[in-house]
């Protein structure tokens, strides 16, 4: 069954994810004039650069929407963000700086909650502003059809008639002006920005060039810590978790997770914490580049992983990291609610996050520069007396115990020595000149 419509379905209800910007404003008016019954849906994701959400539905009505709804997605977004922290669902990193998958998390929430709202209104055709080269077109496609199996997709930016008539920002602005709307294009930035309560993404235009870096970005969730005139003072922060849930910051307990995240963003943002520059593979395997902000996610992630390493054993931590890499990629691909992702999430939340209770004290400085000052938890398995260099009573083990443990190592040491001898005899390994160390041999071909 065809789910993607190449032309505008005239006379039918069409839902559009409406941001109030130039693109969706022009698209809504154009679809209305061409005969579609337009329904506008706006997701309140707590975007830090959006000042008046209530104005957006009113604007949609003025452009010809039969109905316009504002859907509050903030609580669900924070819920998914915390789940990502609990399961370590982050697969993109460079030099220790992590991208916290904030855009994929936002798409998972938007794609399900807006389509659910459309379904309530009997709207089974959905349009949004994603382009065919990006990740979002596939993410929204998957989440939309998961939520409404009868959904059909109409995207103005895949409709050749729309492209021919309104193919650029100048054409769209002129179209709105010609129809009596005093729409002035905002000044062109050197890059594009997309944001939600969890984080911000800066990409495209000048940022497609790798010789343009973070210094051309004007942060919307933090401070430009790289500038000499940007004053950033060290700050001590205490983060508390209970059974994997962040519950308190600097002694203030939060019952509303959205309020907690807003405060975490404010704290981390004062230092530029969580900003990073990444080259990544899009879903279609072509590489793209983005500069990201996520001050609250970064703060909570640091504290969570500090408790994690003090509470769980090595094998559990290793499995958490392996599963997190896989889960992060599934999230990025728009598969956050697929069964394989739910399995990995539930495993981490049940067996890892449930034990994460305690407080972490940090000193934040500039950017991602911080120090861990204290870690407290009733569940810590870190017990310094076990390995103390001082003489202790009731030692966990004795010199004789260690002799026995080392003697058992002779079994695998003997096996390894035998293998190295075999590799040397076949020429795979050669002894390095002047040293008793093995090196890989050259191809004998």
Curated annotation (Swiss-Prot):
InterPro entries: Arg_succ_synth_type2_subfam, Arginosuc_syn_C, Arginosuc_syn_N, Arginosuc_synth, Arginosuc_synth_CS, Arginosuc_synth_type_1_subfam, AS_cat/multimer_dom_body, AS_multimer_C_tail. Homotetramer. It is an enzyme of class 6 (ligase). Pathway: Amino-acid biosynthesis; L-arginine biosynthesis; L-arginine from L-ornithine and carbamoyl phosphate: step 2/3. Its EC number is 6.3.4.5. The keyword rRNA-binding does not apply. It comes from Bradyrhizobium sp. (strain BTAi1 / ATCC BAA-1182). L-citrulline binds at residues 99, 135, 139, 192, 201, 203, 280. ATP binds at residues 17-25, 43, 129, 131, 136, 194. This is Argininosuccinate synthase. PANTHER family: ARGININOSUCCINATE SYNTHASE. It catalyses: L-citrulline + L-aspartate + ATP = 2-(N(omega)-L-arginino)succinate + AMP + diphosphate + H(+). Its main location: cytoplasm.
């Amino acid at each position: 069954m065809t789910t993607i419509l190449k032309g505008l379905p005239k006379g039918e209800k069409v839902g559009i994810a409406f941001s109030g910007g130039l693109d969706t404003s022009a698209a809504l008016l154009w679809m209305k004039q061409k005969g579609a019954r337009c329904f506008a849906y706006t997701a309140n994701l707590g975007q830090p650069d959006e000042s008046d959400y209530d104005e957006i539905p009113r604007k949609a009505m003025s452009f010809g929407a039969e109905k316009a709804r504002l859907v509050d997605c903030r609580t669900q977004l924070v819920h998914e963000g915390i789940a990502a922290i609990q399961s370590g669902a982050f697969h993109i990193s460079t030099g220790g700086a992590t991208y916290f998958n904030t855009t994929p998390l936002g798409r998972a929430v938007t794609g399900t909650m807006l389509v659910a709202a459309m379904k309530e209104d009997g709207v089974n055709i959905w349009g949004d502003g994603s382009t065919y080269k990006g990740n979002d077109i596939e993410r929204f496609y998957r989440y939309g059809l998961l939520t409404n199996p009868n959904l059909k997709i109409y995207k103005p930016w895949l409709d050749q008639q729309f492209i021919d008539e309104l193919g650029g920002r100048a054409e769209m602005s002129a179209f709105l002006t010609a129809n009596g709307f005093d729409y002035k294009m905002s000044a062109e930035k050197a890059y594009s920005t997309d944001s939600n309560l969890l984080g911000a993404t800066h990409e495209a235009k000048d940022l497609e060039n790798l010789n343009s870096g973070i210094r051309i970005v004007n942060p919307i969730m933090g401070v430009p810590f790289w500038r000499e005139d940007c004053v950033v003072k060290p700050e001590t922060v205490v983060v508390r978790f209970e059974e994997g849930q962040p519950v308190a910051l600097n002694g203030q307990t939060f019952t509303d997770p959205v309020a907690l995240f807003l405060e975490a963003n404010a704290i981390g943002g004062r230092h530029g914490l969580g900003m990073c520059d990444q080259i990544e593979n899009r879903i279609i395997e072509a590489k793209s580049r983005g500069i990201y902000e996520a001050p609250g996610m970064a703060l909570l992630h640091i504290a969570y992983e500090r408790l994690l390493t003090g509470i769980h054993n090595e094998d559990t931590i290793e499995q958490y990291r392996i599963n997190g890499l896989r889960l992060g990629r599934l999230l990025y691909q728009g598969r956050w609610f697929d069964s394989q992702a739910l399995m990995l999430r539930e495993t981490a939340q049940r067996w890892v996050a449930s034990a994460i209770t305690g407080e972490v004290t940090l000193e934040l400085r500039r950017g991602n520069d911080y120090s861990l000052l204290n870690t407290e938890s009733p569940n810590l398995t870190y017990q310094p007396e076990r390995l103390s260099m001082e003489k202790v009573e009731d030692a966990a083990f004795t010199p004789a115990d260690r002799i026995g443990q080392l003697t058992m190592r002779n079994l695998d040491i003997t096996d390894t020595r035998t293998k190295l001898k075999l590799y040397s005899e076949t020429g795979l390994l050669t002894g390095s000149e002047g040293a008793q160390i093995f090196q890989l041999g050259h191809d004998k071909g």
